[in-house]
Amino acid sequence: MNSPLRGIWLWLPLLLTWLTPEVSSSWWYMGATGGSSRVMCDNVPGLVSSQRQLCHRHPDVMRAIGLGVTEWTSECQYQFRQHRWNCNTLDRDHSLFGRVLLRSSRESAFVYAISSAGVVFAVTRACSQGEVKSCSCDPKKMGSGKDSKGVFDWGGCSDNIDYGIKFARAFVDAKERKGKDARALMNLHNNRAGRKSVKRFLKQECKCHGVSGSCSLRTCWLAMADFRKTGDYLWRKYNGAIQVVMNQDGTGFTVANERFKKPTKNDLVYFENSPDYCIRDRETGSLGTAGRVCNLTSRGMDSCEVMCCGRGYDTSHVTRMIKCGCKFHWCCAVRCQDCLEALDVHTCKAPKNADWKSPT
């Protein structure tokens, strides 16, 4: 291929990304609407027709998804707690995260993956708890099975994760399937990676039956692990996310750097490098790090040097109430005293340029 054409193909992915309309998963706002399912379905802007139909047809599932938004956003904030961008959400913003996720960055890849995983987790859990009419426990886990410890009987309530994945795919992917641009393909890939991550941590739990706990008989079921497992796994995928470009026919990806491996279905992918998130920026949606607490003794991302972007920090002396002198009393209580602890809190200085306060 001659060099001018090669240059066009190198720039095409960026052009596709820049020309992509403002994309956001508006269903993320479902956690903030509250009220009945009809209120939720009619008041979340930006849902496509098939999403709104599913919303009206399955109000019990929508309640579970709405409650699940709090869980996966909290997990996102936990994973990013020591980073300049800390997965902060914006009140009264229908996109939940503002403009920051319009960039096809690693952060966007993570949020799309963990939100998709959050839907799988919330819907599957609601099924097992009998809160959804259209599903229940996994109907395939019946009869007997065999593992390394021998034969067992399927019993209890195995989490119906296949239903959760199927519903998440139909609902979450609906808006992206209508698009043919690069960002839609990126979102679909990361959505799928998120769904798959929940099933990865499905574990078998068993209960023993028999004389004196001999475990001559076992009843087993499949259960999802705590959502933190999924969050930790996707965090590792975020740190190993692969930068990609569109292939020449616009149907898939290829690695931006030939030295890196081709992404698998489990990997997160992104197009654009992230901003540094140091200062408040209306264009990128960054809220900056002014006022963020930093760790004076750390050498990691939460260190005052890194978190404050070299601007320095302020130190305040504060006291807080803690439990101390705890003692175990027979039987069966732990009694503690209330003590005041004095400590220094370090917070990042604001940029000297007054323009940093411009609203996002």
UniProtKB/Swiss-Prot annotation:
Entry GO terms, CC: cytoplasm; extracellular space
Entry's localization field: Secreted, Extracellular space, Extracellular matrix; Secreted
One Pfam family of this chain: wnt
SMART domains, per database record: WNT1
Glycosylation (residues): 295
Post-translational changes noted in the entry: Palmitoleoylation is required for efficient binding to frizzled receptors. Depalmitoleoylation leads to Wnt signaling pathway inhibition.
Gene Ontology molecular-function annotations: cytokine activity; frizzled binding
O-palmitoleoyl serine lipid attachment residues: 212
Biological-process GO terms, alphabetical: atrial cardiac muscle tissue morphogenesis; canonical Wnt signaling pathway; cardiac epithelial to mesenchymal transition; cardiac muscle cell proliferation; cell fate commitment; cell proliferation in midbrain; cell-cell signaling; cellular response to transforming growth factor beta stimulus
TM region positions: none
Keyword Signal assigned: yes
Keywords: Developmental protein, Disulfide bond, Extracellular matrix, Glycoprotein, Lipoprotein, Secreted, Signal, Wnt signaling pathway
Disulphide bridges: 76-87, 127-135, 137-157, 206-220, 208-215, 278-309, 294-304, 308-348, 324-339, 326-336, 331-332
InterPro entries reported in the protein's UniProt record: Wnt (IPR005817), Wnt2 (IPR009140), Wnt_C (IPR043158), Wnt_CS (IPR018161)
Main location: secreted
Cleaved signal peptide residues: 1-25
Family the entry assigns: Belongs to the Wnt family.
Function field: Ligand for members of the frizzled family of seven transmembrane receptors. Functions in the canonical Wnt signaling pathway that results in activation of transcription factors of the TCF/LEF family. Functions as a upstream regulator of FGF10 expression. Plays an important role in embryonic lung development. May contribute to embryonic brain development by regulating the proliferation of dopaminergic precursors and neurons.
Name the record gives this protein: Protein Wnt-2
Species: Callithrix jacchus (White-tufted-ear marmoset)
